[in-house]
Swiss-Prot record:
WD repeat locations: 389-428, 431-471, 499-532, 537-576, 579-618, 641-679, 686-724
Family membership: Belongs to the WD repeat WDR91 family.
This protein's name: WD repeat-containing protein 91
Subcellular location: Early endosome membrane; Late endosome membrane
GO biological process, one term: early endosome to late endosome transport
UniProt keyword Coiled coil present: yes
Coiled coil: 178-207
Polar residues composition-biased segments: 270-279, 303-315, 349-365
GO cellular component: cytosol; early endosome membrane; endosome membrane; late endosome membrane
Amino acid sequence: MASAVERTDDLVREYLIYRGFTSTLKHLDSEIKTDKEKGFRVDKIMDQLQLLIQSCDLTGLKEYWANLERRLFCRLEDVYKPTVSKLRTSLYRFYLIHTVQVKNVEKTQEFFQKQALELQAQAEWRDWFSLPFIPAPEQNPSFSAYFSRQWADTFLVSLHNFLSVLFQCMPLPALLSFDSEVQRITSLQEDNEQLRQTVFALQGESRLKKDEQMVHHKLPPYVQHMDRLGDTELDLVSSQRNVNMATPSRNFFSTFLPQGRRAPGRTAPGPQSSPTQSALGRKDAAASMQSSKAKDKEVKPPSVSSMTAELSTSHPRQRRHQDHEKERKELFSKHAAQGSEKKTDSDPDTQTEAPPDQTDSANQTRVCDVGGAGAEQPFIKLSQEEYGEHHSSIMHCRVDCSGRRVASLDVDGVVKVWAFNPIMQTKATIMSKSPLLSLEWAAKPDRLLLLGSGVGTVKLYDTDAKKCLYEMTIDDVHPRILSLACSPSGTSFVCSAAAHSGAVMESEPRGSAPVSGQLLLWDTKTVKQQLQFALEPGPVAINCTAFNHNGNLLVTGAADGIIRLFDMQRYESALSWKAHDGEVYSVEFSYDENTVFSIGEDGKFVQWNIHRCGVKQSEYSLSQDAVGPFVLSGYSGYKQVQVPRGRLFAFDSEGQHVLTCSSTGGNIYRLNKAEAGLESVLSLAGHKAPVVTVDWCSAMDCGTCLTASMDGKIKLSTLLAQKP
């Protein structure tokens, strides 16, 4: 209910601004600030009650409780009135115990003076009037239980639960019921998307299985036409069979590979067709296309009649029939391996006159080659699309939490919000007067986008309404907002602000000395700074930030090469260690969140154990194409250099594979032990300029990989995960 109230308040505020009712908006804001129900947020109400108790404000406590009874408890049925009375009694006793614990005798006596008329007739308060006169009430058997921490916690939890259930059961006005409809529609859309992805994955698996079965059960072309062969042609089959037996047998998966990727041990056929192929070509000439007829005329094999005459003089008719029967037995005894063995390679000219079954086999090879060698690869690349709305180098490219939209930022400060399902379509274009350096999707709600600028401000942009909701001034001394990270569990976000680096352009490499900076915590609801983190040994620019799944941990990589791990429950640094020689460019939690991965200026891709400070679990060396700075060269000595700003690597849904940048696309590696190194499993090529940032969004068995390059092009590759 609290979220629905907050959302409704925002919508009403937006409507009043749209209508120009500024005075009404001012009254609304002032009343929201003094709202005693705190937007029906139980945690805020509990905080207010405890604040009044800790300040020993008896009058304020009575007025606040009376307001709750007048606004909330009066709507309850009579059967719940004893519960409300018991909670009020426990609240007053909680107040009294606090005054005794802080040794504020005046407040203790004041309570009994003001409440004497109301409480002296109640039997449960009869013994409590002696409380101010007992020297050590915490040791008295009548009061010792109330001084225990267990009783206080039990009371607070009971009151919290009572208010929570009350808010859930309260009848809602019609205006507030929209939130349940929005949640229901959103849930249906998510279920729809998951089912669509499931159907898509099942269709891909079904197509692969069907194609595999076709390869298993496909017979060699000469066997399919065996019934139509005459005696003379059987002799040619036998002679061709003897030639084929001398060649090494093929592996079954070689049928999935294109001609260029097959094993070098195989000898390619000559430019001249075999007698069998030419004979079959003439037998099927009536059913083939005109192009096949033309090519058949170009190929001039040896005369069939002359070869038949030679074979007939050396082999009797009975021997030919025996060879024929032996041929059939050998065929059916070696079903799958024999079928792939008898399938012969041919040059482009002879492929045109092959029967239809050979064309099907060629199609099968093409489909499986989309993702590599079929079962040998963990992913199959189903498709690759290009988004080309940007006209300069990309800095950031991120998919939102729902996996439906993408936000991309280029060096000109242009932000594009676009969808790729079911079709690629631009939803919003954001152009800022000030240069933009960073972006991040908000976790709740996921329609909001945070944009960090180079003049010390962060904008909160609504991608649905296509307008800026707020512009927060972060720091004038540290105007460059290098990194943004939203907490998955709330409305707060972490902001990294840095001083000017001294470079002429943002895309130029930074100097050797670490740049000064701050790490701040802000709230998108209150639009206020909550905290400034302490950075040891001194203030330094934080290049990258990342939360774990529940927002309890925050990992950062800085310009001084140090990785810092923060406890977000205590808002303090838990660990820090020197990770790289030079700056830390990108950092992420692993799938199980027991380790942290980082890429630094030294070209190292390192896995760190967060339970053992500074201990490397694995280390890999990457090329400059994957680390940066990225260089784009052109004609007449043109050269563009860009330092890393976005994510340099991203994991799949199970954390077993990682996507990195390269000069022509993205590379997917399998994470092995340190001594085994990174194992390349798939290359997502297609770019003509260096890729500078990547992202990987997984849904069901299908994953979407984003690779963005310096020429403004973004490639969207759809992958199908193959289950082992």
